[in-house]
Amino acid sequence: MKVRTSVKPICDKCKVIKRNGIVRIICTNPKHKQRQG
C-alpha cells in the first residue's frame, strides 16, 4: 500500500474507488495498491 497525494491508475486493471472520502486504487497487482493521504 502506497500513500500518495496524487493517486493514478498504473495499469489497465487498476480501479479507482472512493471509500469514506478516501480515494483508493485496487489492482490485481499488490504493488499497485494506493491510497490518498
Curated annotation (Swiss-Prot):
Arranged from A to Z, the UniProt key words for this protein are: Ribonucleoprotein, Ribosomal protein
Give the GO terms filed under biological process for this record. translation
| GO CC, one annotated term | cytoplasm
- Kindly give the PROSITE patterns that the UniProt entry links to this protein: RIBOSOMAL_L36
Disulfide bond annotation, renumbered to this chain: none
Which InterPro entries does the protein's record reference?
A: Ribosomal_bL36 (IPR000473), Ribosomal_bL36_sp (IPR035977)
Q: Which domain of life is it from?
A: Bacteria
Question: What family does this belong to?
Answer: Belongs to the bacterial ribosomal protein bL36 family.
| Record-given protein name | Large ribosomal subunit protein bL36
Species of origin: Treponema denticola (strain ATCC 35405 / DSM 14222 / CIP 103919 / JCM 8153 / KCTC 15104)
Higher taxonomy: Bacteria, Pseudomonadati, Spirochaetota, Spirochaetia, Spirochaetales
